[in-house]
């Protein structure tokens, strides 16, 4: 089976490895090298690095819509195109090239959380379950029928980064299982997505990192986990803007205005919210590194506590 693989970030690397064990990967498509780091040097994608290490042909077109790119893809004669977090919407002309169509590994239980940030939005919303889907691609954004899926609970203190790594491996396993069925002539049966359950996972933005104490503690705790490792939640704490890397929601009654420090100890700094309180466990001052609440308190002797 001849497969063209299209993917870009770390999430796609386990799936690329999985495909190479199941089929003949005739080409890998990934986004062009981008400036990164303080020096803004051109940096290859994780998928490109993996493909080069495996000796696979790599293509990095700016667009898939030009006649030249379409002809290049047709010349590869793929039986199937596998897409995992490629970051480019495939035009219908590309979807029509392989006999078996195009498969996509998506990090949610579709139709919930279609779009760019399904992992982060699931945690932000307080979902207790998520998973990965293998989808038959069509022209719409994550609208195609689901071929297979795997479910998993979202752990109470799991961050987006941790869930990302788990789902990447689950997606690779699901893809391997799907390819195994296809090779055996047992093509997975497409199941149309139900319109009633559709939600959209819009792309994250830095502006969302600013937390507002005028919200329930549970919601803020979910956002701290969702925005880890990027963009990292930020709050104003007694006049200082700090980033929050770890926090817990406390179910307690208080009569203080949101943003008031209720208690401070080596376990954390408890801040009043609209409902309950948020315990800040790991913080980062501007220009510094992430530190424990105890270390932060040693540096902030002026912190005022109101019981």
Curated annotation (Swiss-Prot):
Its EC number is 2.1.2.9. GO terms for molecular function: methionyl-tRNA formyltransferase activity. Keywords: Protein biosynthesis, Transferase. (6S)-5,6,7,8-tetrahydrofolate binds at residues 108-111. GO terms for cellular component: cytosol. InterPro entries: Fmt, Formyl_trans_C, Formyl_trans_C_sf, Formyl_transf_N, Formyl_transf_N_sf, Formyl_transferase-like_C_sf, GART_AS, Met-tRNA-FMT_C. The keyword Nucleus does not apply. The keyword Protein biosynthesis applies. It catalyses: L-methionyl-tRNA(fMet) + (6R)-10-formyltetrahydrofolate = N-formyl-L-methionyl-tRNA(fMet) + (6S)-5,6,7,8-tetrahydrofolate + H(+). Attaches a formyl group to the free amino group of methionyl-tRNA(fMet). The formyl group appears to play a dual role in the initiator identity of N-formylmethionyl-tRNA by promoting its recognition by IF2 and preventing the misappropriation of this tRNA by the elongation apparatus. Belongs to the Fmt family. This is Methionyl-tRNA formyltransferase. It comes from Xylella fastidiosa (strain 9a5c).
């Amino acid at each position: 089976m001849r497969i063209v693989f299209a993917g870009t970030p770390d999430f796609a690397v386990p799936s690329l490895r999985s495909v190479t064990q199941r089929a003949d990967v005739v080409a890998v498509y990934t986004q062009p090298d981008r400036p990164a780091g303080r020096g803004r040097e051109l940096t290859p994608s994780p998928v490109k690095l993996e493909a080069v290490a495996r000796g696979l042909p790599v293509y990095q077109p700016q667009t898939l819509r030009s006649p030249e790119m379409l002809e290049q893809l047709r010349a590869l004669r793929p039986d199937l195109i596998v897409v995992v977090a490629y970051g480019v919407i495939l035009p219908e002309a590309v979807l029509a090239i392989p006999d078996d169509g195009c498969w996509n590994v998506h990090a949610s239980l579709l139709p919930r959380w279609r779009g760019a940030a399904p992992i982060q939005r699931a945690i932000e919303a307080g979902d207790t379950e998520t998973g990965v889907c293998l989808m038959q691609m069509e022209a719409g954004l994550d609208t195609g029928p689901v071929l297979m899926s795997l479910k998993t609970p979202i752990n109470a203190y799991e961050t987006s980064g941790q869930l990302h790594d788990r789902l990447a491996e689950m997606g690779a396993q699901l893809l391997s299982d799907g390819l195994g069925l296809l090779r055996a002539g047992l093509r997975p049966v497409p199941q149309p997505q139900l319109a009633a359950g559709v939600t959209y996972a819009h792309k994250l933005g830095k502006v969302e990192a600013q937390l507002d104490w005028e919200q329930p503690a549970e919601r803020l705790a979910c956002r701290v986990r969702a925005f880890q490792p990027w963009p990292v939640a930020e709050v104003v704490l007694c006049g200082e803007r700090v980033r929050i890397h770890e926090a817990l929601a406390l179910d307690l009654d208080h009569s203080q205005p949101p943003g008031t420090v209720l208690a401070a100890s080596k376990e954390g700094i408890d801040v009043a919210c609209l409902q309950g309180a948020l315990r800040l466990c790991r913080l980062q001052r501007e220009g510094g590194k992430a530190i424990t609440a105890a270390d932060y308190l040693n540096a902030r002797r002026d912190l005022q506590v109101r019981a």
